[in-house]
Curated annotation (Swiss-Prot):
Cited NCBIfam families: PRK06076.1-1, PRK06076.1-2
Predominant localisation class: membrane
Name of the protein in question: NADH-quinone oxidoreductase subunit H
Source organism (scientific name): Psychrobacter arcticus (strain DSM 17307 / VKM B-2377 / 273-4)
Lineage per the UniProt record: Bacteria, Pseudomonadati, Pseudomonadota, Gammaproteobacteria, Moraxellales
Catalysis: reaction(s): a quinone + NADH + 5 H(+)(in) = a quinol + NAD(+) + 4 H(+)(out)
Matches recorded under InterPro entries: NADH_UbQ_OxRdtase_su1/FPO, NADH_UbQ_OxRdtase_su1_CS
C-alpha cells in the first residue's frame, strides 16, 4: 500500500523559496544591519576621539588609564554603563520615560538609511531621501520632549521645552539651507545629488547655504555651543537628568550618531560625497575612503567647536536663528532660483 507524502521535502522547499528576489532582500537586510552596527561603533569611538582631541588642544592628558595609551577606555566605558543600575524613579511616567531614549536612538539610526557611502554601498536609494531625513528629525523632537515631561522634574521639563523650540526652529533653517542644492540638482535623492557634483562640488555655488547648514546642524544635534537643552550650569544636565544606565546610554550614543549623520550629510550635499577631490583618479583608493575622510573632517569640526566656543544665552540662540539664519537662507534660495531661471530655464 502506497502512503501519500504530505510533508514536503524541506531542502527542496527551501531551495524553491530562495529565488533571486529573496537573496536580494536578504543581502539588503544584512547590509543594512552591518551599516547600522558600524555607525553605532563609529559614534562610540567618536566619544574617545573627542576626549583625546580636546585634551590635545587644551594641552593636557586625555584618557590614559585603561589599556596602552588609553586604547581600551571605550571598552571600560561600555562595561561601566552596561552594568550600571537602570533605575526608573517612582514619580515618572514609566512608559514615556522608557520610550523616549528608544525613539532617540531609532530616529538617529533610521536617518542613516538614506546616506550613500559609495556608488554601491548604502541602505536605501530613495527619491524622497531628504524628506525622509526631515521626517525622522521631526519625530526625534518628541524623544527629548517625552524624556523631559515624563521625568516629572522641573529641570528636565525646561530642557525638553528648550529642545523642542530650538530644534523646530533650526530645522526650518536646515531645510531652507539645502533647498538650493535640491534646486540645482532637481532631486531629493542623495545619490543623484552626489553624482551631480562630478563637475564641481556645491560648496562653491552654495557657500552661504553651507554656512547656514553647519550652524543649523550643530543646533539640531544639541551640540556645543547650542547645547541649551542640557546646559549643565543652568539645567543640571537638562532633559536626561533622571536617566541612568542603558537608557542614558541610548540618549548619549544617539547624540553622537546624529553628529556622524550631519557630518555625512555635509559631505554628500556640499563636498561631493564619495567623489575624489579635483577629479583625482586613483584606482587603489575606493570611493568609500573619500567619503569617510570628509565625514571625519566634519566630525572633528564639531569637536573643535566644543573646545573653542562659548555657550550663548538661550534668547541669543533663538534670535540668531530667526534674525540671521532665516534671512541668509531665504536670500540664498532666491539668488539660486534667479540664476537657474536665467541660465537654465529648462532645468
Amino acid at each position: 500500500m502506497q502512503v501519500t507524502r504530505i510533508i514536503p521535502d524541506v531542502p527542496s522547499f527551501l531551495a524553491s523559496m530562495m529565488t533571486f528576489d529573496t537573496w536580494s532582500i536578504l543581502f539588503m537586510v544584512v547590509q543594512s544591519l552591518v551599516i547600522f552596527l558600524v555607525v553605532v561603533i563609529v559614534a562610540a569611538m567618536m566619544i574617545i576621539y573627542e576626549r583625546r582631541m580636546l585634551a590635545l588642544w587644551q594641552d593636557r592628558y586625555g584618557p590614559n588609564r585603561v589599556g596602552p595609551f588609553g586604547s581600551l577606555q571605550l571598552v571600560a566605558d561600555m562595561l561601566k554603563i552596561f552594568f550600571k543600575e537602570d533605575w526608573t524613579p517612582n514619580f515618572t511616567d514609566k512608559f514615556m520615560f522608557t520610550l523616549a531614549p528608544a525613539v532617540a536612538m531609532f530616529t538617529a539610526l533610521a536617518s542613516f538609511a538614506i546616506i550613500p557611502i559609495s556608488p554601491t554601498l548604502g541602505v536605501a536609494d530613495w527619491d524622497i531621501g531628504i524628506l525622509f531625513f526631515f521626517a525622522m528629525a521631526g519625530i526625534a523632537v518628541y524623544a527629548v520632549l517625552f524624556g523631559g515631561w515624563a521625568s516629572a522634574n522641573k529641570f528636565s521639563l525646561l530642557g525638553g521645552l528648550r529642545s523642542a523650540a530650538q530644534t523646530i526652529s533650526y530645522e526650518v533653517f536646515l531645510g531652507l539651507s539645502l533647498m538650493g542644492v535640491v534646486a540645482l540638482t532637481g532631486s531629493f535623492n542623495l545619490r543623484a545629488i552626489v553624482e551631480a557634483q562630478a563637475d564641481g562640488w556645491y560648496i562653491i555655488p552654495q557657500f552661504f547655504g553651507f554656512l547656514t547648514f553647519v550652524v543649523a546642524g550643530v543646533a539640531v544635534t544639541h551640540r556645543h555651543p547650542f547645547d541649551q537643552p542640557e546646559a549643565e550650569q543652568e539645567l543640571a544636565e537638562g532633559y536626561h537628568v533622571e536617566y541612568s544606565g542603558m537608557k542614558f546610554g541610548m540618549f548619549f550614543i544617539g547624540e553622537y550618531v546624529n553628529v556622524v549623520l550631519i557630518s555625512a550629510l555635509m559631505t554628500c550635499l556640499f563636498f561631493g560625497g564619495w567623489l575624489a577631490p579635483f577629479n583625482l583618479d586613483i584606482p587603489f583608493i575606493p570611493p568609500a575612503f573619500w567619503f569617510m575622510i570628509k565625514t571625519l573632517f566634519f566630525m572633528t569640526m564639531f569637536i573643535l567647536a566644543r573646545g573653542s566656543l562659548m555657550r550663548p544665552r538661550y534668547d541669543q540662540v533663538m534670535n540668531f536663528g530667526w534674525k540671521v539664519c532665516l534671512p541668509v537662507t531665504l536670500i540664498n534660495l532666491l539668488v539660486t532660483a534667479a540664476v537657474i531661471l536665467i541660465f537654465s530655464p529648462t532645468l
